[in-house]
Swiss-Prot record:
InterPro entries listed in its UniProt record: GHMP_kinase_C_dom, GHMP_kinase_C_sf, GHMP_kinase_N_dom, IspE, Ribosomal_Su5_D2-typ_SF, Ribsml_uS5_D2-typ_fold_subgr
Organism from which the protein derives: Mycobacterium leprae (strain TN)
Biological process terms in GO annotation: isopentenyl diphosphate biosynthetic process, methylerythritol 4-phosphate pathway; terpenoid biosynthetic process
Any matching Pfam family: GHMP_kinases_N
Name of the protein in its database record: 4-diphosphocytidyl-2-C-methyl-D-erythritol kinase
Entry similarity comment: Belongs to the GHMP kinase family. IspE subfamily.
Length: 323
């Protein structure tokens, strides 16, 4: 297919679609600095991508559009208030084109659940448009665009396990060959990240929660591939704020531990709770008991680490149209 804006030379526009699979994340360790003058908090965190994924399909279109299906889709905006929409505009601006694509997101990552589902979708749009438009932008350019969109977007590109600093966008790969087994408990409620940070600042002013130790032991446990070594080291300084805003999380955390998890933690700003298990069999057992305990909306079993945003369906060959 060829197209022209009436002024520029006719250019090639690939047809077809691209689907990108992108994982949610949990924070194995999250230490929060004091609020800076710019309103942000400096972070030290250990990101861990898990096998709960969204699928994002991007096609060429006459105008930019966005649709969603799946987990929490009715609660997500489908206009410029959605970070995936802004990702399409940013990519198009970067390469000097109009953002004429349709985006369809099939969600499994919970909305406002502390697993960076929106950031994951934005990363997926960048990867999909890079492939669909055959731009061949290098990874460093994608990471630069990702950082402009939000603090969690670069890790959604990166995947695996990584140490994040700054606002979370500065990443260093953590090498771990192990597969860790998780049970994820979705809450009935949602928590907005700004509200959690506001509550965190209030609690810190009165000395709660205590600050975490340095993340070195967490990194060592990951390298050792030992879930029992890792379990007591999981920590999240935002957890107290999340629980303060949603006290029902205490019941979920307690139920997961009583079901046999090695450790439980609120993921990021919450309210999703992540439970580390000793094995795949243990994760299934813990998930079944947690699902029957009536303390959460939905339970998912997942593994990590997994890769970041990646194409799972490449564009169709030139000259071929969609069926």
């Amino acid at each position: 297919m060829f197209a022209s804006d009436g002024n520029a030379a006719t250019q090639w526009m690939p047809t077809g679609s691209v689907t990108v699979q992108v994982p949610g994340k949990i924070n194995l360790y999250l230490a929060v600095g004091d609020c800076c003058d710019n309103g942000y908090h400096e972070l030290v965190t250990v990101f861990h991508a898990v096998s709960l994924v969204d699928q994002v399909t991007v096609r060429n279109a006459d105008v930019l559009s966005l649709g969603l299906v799946g987990e929490g889709a009715n609660h997500v905006p489908t206009d410029e208030h959605n970070i995936a929409w802004r990702a399409a505009e940013l990519m198009a601006e970067h390469v000097g084109r109009a953002p004429d694509v349709s985006i369809m997101i099939d969600k499994s990552i919970p909305v406002a659940g502390g697993m960076a589902g929106g950031s994951a979708d934005a990363a997926a749009v960048l990867v999909a448009m890079n492939s669909l438009w055959e731009l061949s932008l290098p990874r460093r350019d994608l990471c630069m665009l990702a950082a402009k969109l939000g603090s969690d977007v670069p890790f959604a590109l990166h995947g695996g396990t990584a140490l994040g600093t700054g606002r979370g966008e500065e990443l260093a790969t953590v090498l771990s060959r192990a597969t860790f087994h998780w049970v994820l408990a979705f809450a009935d409620s949602s928590l907005l990240t700004p509200a959690v940070y506001t509550e965190f600042d209030r609690l810190r002013d009165v000395g709660n929660p205590p600050r975490l130790a340095e993340p070195g032991p967490v990194l060592a446990a990951l390298v050792a591939a030992d879930p029992e070594q890792l379990a007591p080291l999981l920590g999240n300084e935002l957890q107290a704020a999340a629980v303060s805003l949603d006290p029902a999380l205490r019941c979920a955390l307690r139920a997961g531990m009583e079901a046999g998890a090695l450790a439980g933690i609120v993921s990021g700003s919450g309210p999703t709770c992540a439970f580390l298990c000793a094995s795949a069999t243990s994760a299934i057992d813990v998930g079944a008991q947690l699902a029957g305990a009536g303390v959460c909306r939905t339970v998912r079993v997942a593994t990590g680490p997994v890769p970041g945003a990646r194409v799972v369906h490449a564009p169709m060959s030139r000259g071929l149209n969609d069926m």
